[in-house]
Amino acid sequence: MEQYRGTTILSVRRGAEVALGGDGQVTLGNIVIKSTARKIRRLYQEKVLAGFAGGTADAFTLFERFEAKLDKHSGHLLRSAVELAKDWRTDRMLRRLEAMLAVADREHSLIITGNGDVLEPELGIAAIGSGGAFAQSAARALLENTDLAPLEIVKKSLTIAGDICIYSNQNHVIEVLGDRGQDSGVRE
């Protein structure tokens, strides 16, 4: 049985500000099932941003598990991610899940892989999903060559990825944790 999949999730960090966004397309094989899915969530008292790529049902299971870890560890992102990864490696059900998470708080950006690995990406850019490499390339160029804020970099990079990747679209949801306490969300 085919799974729902295909997406672009991107997180960009500059200074004390981080933006995490994703497109809204869900595909089943080569058919677009939904174009306005929300793959980005705020967790733990709105202090943690999380986005998923991969099987939709699998990703929601991981969201629930990750949120439980955040609650258990008082919102400590690194510890919660490592504890989820430990569970992922030892729990038979979790090992079969086909999804990845990109998560961020005001201090760290992480990728939690389908193998149960926790990676802190270089340059403050985390990208997952079928359009992730396209978005990451665009974000890196913009981060290194402009003074754009993370929100603008994520917007432009997701647009570029959506133009290239057939499993991504131009319906974006972007959440921001800001250094001035201006946390916000954007839906385009």
UniProtKB/Swiss-Prot annotation:
Gene3D superfamilies linked: Glutamine Phosphoribosylpyrophosphate, subunit 1, domain 1 (3.60.20.10)
Family that this chain belongs to: Belongs to the peptidase T1B family. HslV subfamily.
Q: How is its activity regulated?
A: Allosterically activated by HslU binding.
Which keywords, in A-to-Z order, does the entry hold? Allosteric enzyme, Cytoplasm, Hydrolase, Metal-binding, Protease, Sodium, Stress response, Threonine protease
Q: What is its EC number?
A: 3.4.25.2
List the catalysed reactions.
Answer: ATP-dependent cleavage of peptide bonds with broad specificity
Mind telling me which InterPro entries this protein's record contains?
Answer: ATP-dep_Prtase_HsIV_su, Ntn_hydrolases_N, Proteasome_sua/b, Proteasome_suB-type
The superkingdom listed in its UniProt entry is Bacteria
Instruction: State how it assembles.
Output: A double ring-shaped homohexamer of HslV is capped on each side by a ring-shaped HslU homohexamer. The assembly of the HslU/HslV complex is dependent on binding of ATP.
Q: Is Signal included in the keywords of this UniProt record?
A: no
What the entry lists under NCBIfam families is as follows: ATP_dep_HslV, PRK05456.1
An individual GO BP term: proteolysis involved in protein catabolic process
Q: Where does Na(+) bind?
A: G162, C165, S168
Subcellular location(s) of the protein = Cytoplasm
Q: What is one GO cellular-component annotation here?
A: HslUV protease complex
| Organism lineage string | Bacteria, Pseudomonadati, Pseudomonadota, Betaproteobacteria, Nitrosomonadales
Active-site residue list: T7
Q: Which gene encodes it?
A: hslV
Q: Name one GO molecular function term.
A: threonine-type endopeptidase activity
**Under what name is this protein listed?**
ATP-dependent protease subunit HslV
Q: What is its main location?
A: cytoplasm
What this chain does, per the entry, is described as: Protease subunit of a proteasome-like degradation complex believed to be a general protein degrading machinery.
Q: Where is the signal peptide?
A: none
